[in-house]
Amino acid sequence: YWWSRYWMYSDHELRELCKNFENYNIPLDVLVIDMDWHYTDKGRGSWTGWTWNKELFPDYRKLLKDLKADNGLRVTLNLHPAEGVRSYEEQYEAVARDNGVDPATKQEIPSKKSFIKSMFRMF
């Protein structure tokens, strides 16, 4: 069973949600974390985003590890890669270099074949 809901969940709320699935004996195999796993506010994101929202997920690595260990869950993130990578993303410098762009230019890395290759290597 997959769970997906367009909602601004926090780390704590997702943990509680998973406990409720377990308490009510509802099977859950895959948890989809929707848009707000990354920043979506003006100036730091939009539909496309690559930097974890630290206000909602202060330690996302621990969350993902715990969901797997405690609940056996697979987690997938809702991605909208159409806008490529912008200069405010944490991974921008590495992605820019990987795509032959000088990071100092702050040029957007468009969503094209070379970017997709970088996406799978770096994200």
PLM segments and residue spans:
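Aromatic-lined carbohydrate-binding/catalytic grooves of carbohydrate-active enzymes
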Residues: 1-123
